[in-house]
Amino acid sequence: MIVVFGSLVLLSIIINIAIIASNGGFDNPARSITIPKEQDLWSPSSRIHDGDEFLYNLTISNGNKNIDNYLINILFRNSSGYWNTEFIISNESKSTKISTQLSKSNLLMKEKQVKNQKYIDILDSSILQIKDIAREPKYLIIGAKWDSINTGILNVPIKISSKEYLSSKVGELETFVLSYKVKNLSSNIWISKNLPLPVKAQIYDEEDKLKYKYDILSLNRHIK
């Protein structure tokens, strides 16, 4: 009876751990050493503060086999239910300012902006694309599955592949690397637990051609 009771207790523990890991989106719970906790959850909108300002260097393919380079400045101002957000998008020839409201729950734009749609598309398909992957809070735990990409042939998982101390323009950052591989090259997004947006990304298409890459250049935080 003692042996049977001990086996049941062990089985119960294993089942509970598996349930927790499953809720965190783990492909292989048995290989996950760290049990996910609430403080491991991250979302792209939860750590923004009034007055936070970020500057990025963005390189993006324009679809014509050419590469465009931009400086992207993002300033957040607090408002009820939304962040009043100012984007300044600059390249060698011009600078464009866009003022909009982003939802505090998922960074979606409150209203569509027809006038500056070209630049909105640039933002949505690069730095702000994380909102389409992390539609709800996700675990910053190695092995956690965040989403998947359907190529028509394969269903490619997007998951946390590693933890990395990243040297950046704003200092050394502890980051988690969100990765997926459509062909041969791995697409990676570096996320710091205490920042509301990724600090670096390098993304490739199904032909291993660069879609976009960006790095954070500076940040000015207003944590009270």
Question: Where are the predicted features?
Answer:
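Acidic, serine/threonine-rich low-complexity disordered tracts
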Residues: 10-106, 140-224
